[in-house]
Amino acid sequence: MDFPYPVGHAFPLFLAPMAGVSESPFRLIARRFGADVVVSEFISAVGVARGLEHLFHDMRFEEAERPIGIQLYGADATVMAQAAEMVTEACNPDFIDINFGCPVKKVVKNNGGSGCLKDLDLVQRIIRAVQNATHLPVTVKIRSGWDDAQRDPVAIAQRCREAGARALTLHARTRTQMFSGKANWDEIARVVDALDIPVIGNGDIATAADVVAMRAHTGCAGAMIARGSFGNPWIFAQARDLLAGRPVRPDPRPEERFATALEHARLALRLQGDTRKTALEFRKHLGWYTKGVPGASQLRERLFQIESMQQAEAIFTAYLARDAVEQAA
């Protein structure tokens, strides 16, 4: 079955929508390393409807990021429809994705995100309202249920399909699980069997091999990578190697990791325009990019104190110089 937007490969790889991570700079990096489709951070429909300028700034993207979806969350069908119409006019992404999966307390306390899963009639009203407000394809991201007592991903997925969802991503955990325990890939397989639209698998993809394993286990139409991409955009290229039957490219050496981190930082600074703010917000990314390199803990200790990316670059340069001396000794 076909996706309602261009995907580039028979089995597309998606960068998941993640607050504070799936911003335009990292989306560009992920696309360069092989992500077929990217999705924005989740955006408040209420904020969009109110015309909050910073949200429209957050939704900006470059043509190189396409295909891209803008993800909206909210619990009021009328407001969601208004926001979808405004996003369509202002941004014209390739699709609108509805967030029925976010487990964060500040979102679900107003029945947004996975809070909507407690009321499947509301889920359907939201999907129909958004679909009627835009000419763009409408897709959804769900969890397996609110809790174990209400865990029924097939029923949730079928209701979404009935309401008009054109593709569906399942994170195979409940809201109460948050990110604990294991994602139940068997549930993804059951949803795949139950629907006639593309089903994207999500949950517990930490390596390229996990992508191949998920496809084999579930029969999903694509894989969405979330935390496995943190500081690791190479996961997309390595997964594509495996899917294509090619030898898998090796993990990057420290110099490649550092160069990519700095490229990511330059993109972030271009978007942010504030050297110190960019550096402070980028510390988490530096921690992820340096995971697994020799002496990582001492390196991160220094990187977590930077107040400019020039300081980070100097730290990386000194690290590589010491490494070269040690290898020559």
What does each of the following model-derived ranges do?
Residues 117:
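Aromatic- and acidic-residue-enriched carbohydrate-binding clefts of CAZyme catalytic domains
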Residues 1-10, 14, 19, 24-25, ...:
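Alpha/beta catalytic cores of nucleotide-metabolism and tRNA/nucleoside-modifying enzymes
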Residues 81-112, 120-197, 217:
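Alpha/beta enzyme core
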